[in-house]
């Protein structure tokens, strides 16, 4: 059963300013929480196109959203191909798009997917099970320098060198096969005082490997650009991020596209061609309420940013 508590449900969907006859995109279908709430607000003319690369999520959505067959189009794909698949559907512009980044609870909670440092399972971490690169390959075959780079860049792990060295020493004896083995190596590499603070000692390294396996940051950056391109004037994009790297991409993109360019001094009116592409709906990110945090601890690190296309 695909059970997943949706984060910032109403804030994200209501922030899109739903038009009942509009066309919307959920780039991260997951447990279908956002999609369900959005579909409930559409008329028979409204449409939702939902992306996911996880077969389990798509099958679950087919079952729970069977009442909305006429309005819902499910696409098995990474959202980096957003424009391509919209074109296939004959869709050139949409009224709203949402992204809920990060791993869905069922992926985290299914040990054999290899995302979780709480279960011993084969090293995997592929969002798309048909993809070739897995966590096992990264851990066992990538060079020491590359491991240090991803642990530091994607995990902001200050003990990156020590952890990469431990991995290198261990894999020379025999391949590292499971998440449990990797967790033990990480714990051995981190000094005891540091292990006792800042959450689970493997959290940052697991995040870094997952981002590398799925090329998450580049994929998101590309997809966000495409999303803004296909929005109608007045259309909105809602983005939920779960760590500072994703949030930085979103914040920077929104800021660049909502800022005025350098203009000659003394212009009485800003020429239309110089008006920024976006208007910020949220100056500061929206975070989960205390009530939501009590029900769903995974919402703690969630940040929601919303922008509207001006032209």
Curated annotation (Swiss-Prot):
State the residue spans of region: Disordered. 287-311
- Top-rank lineage group of the source organism: Bacteria
Give residues annotated as binding S-adenosyl-L-methionine. 32-34, 52, 79, 100, 107
Q: What happens when the gene is disrupted?
A: No visible phenotype.
One GO BP annotation of this record:
rRNA base methylation
**Induction and repression of expression:** Transcribed at a low level in exponential phase, it may be further induced in stationary phase. Part of the mraZ-rsmH-ftsL-pbpB operon.
Tell me which family the UniProt entry assigns to this protein: Belongs to the methyltransferase superfamily. RsmH family.
Question: Any idea what this protein is called?
Answer: Ribosomal RNA small subunit methyltransferase H
Q: Which organism is this protein's natural source?
A: Bacillus subtilis (strain 168)
């Amino acid at each position: 059963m695909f059970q997943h508590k949706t984060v910032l449900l109403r804030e994200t969907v209501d922030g899109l300013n739903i038009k009942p006859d509009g066309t919307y995109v959920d780039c991260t279908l997951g447990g279908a929480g956002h999609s369900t709430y959005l579909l409930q607000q559409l008329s028979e003319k409204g449409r939702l196109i939902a992306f996911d690369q996880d077969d389990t999520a798509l099958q679950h959505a087919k079952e729970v959203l069977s009442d909305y067959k006429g309005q819902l189009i499910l696409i098995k794909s990474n959202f980096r191909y957003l424009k391509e698949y919209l074109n296939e559907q004959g869709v050139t512009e949409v009224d709203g798009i949402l992204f809920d980044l990060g791993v869905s609870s069922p992926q985290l909670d299914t040990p054999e997917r290899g995302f979780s440092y709480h279960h011993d399972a084969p090293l995997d971490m592929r969002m798309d099970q048909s993809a070739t690169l897995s966590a096992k390959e990264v851990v066992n075959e990538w060079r020491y320098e590359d491991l240090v780079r991803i642990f530091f860049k994607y995990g902001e792990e200050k003990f990156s060198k020590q952890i990469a060295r431990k991995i290198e020493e261990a894999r020379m004896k025999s391949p590292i096969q499971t998440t449990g083995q990797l967790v033990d190596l990480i714990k051995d590499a981190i000094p005891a005082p540091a292990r006792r603070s800042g959450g689970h000692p493997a959290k940052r390294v697991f995040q870094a490997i997952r981002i590398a396996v799925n090329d998450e940051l580049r994929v998101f950056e590309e997809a966000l650009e495409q999303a803004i391109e296909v929005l109608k004037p007045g259309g909105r994009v809602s983005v939920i991020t779960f760590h500072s790297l994703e949030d930085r991409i979103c914040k920077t993109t929104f800021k660049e596209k909502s800022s005025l360019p350098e203009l000659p001094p003394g212009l009485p009116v800003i020429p239309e061609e110089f008006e920024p592409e976006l208007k910020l709906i949220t100056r500061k990110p929206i975070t989960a309420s205390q009530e939501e945090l009590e029900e769903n601890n995974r919402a703690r690190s969630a940040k929601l940013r919303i922008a509207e296309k001006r032209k």
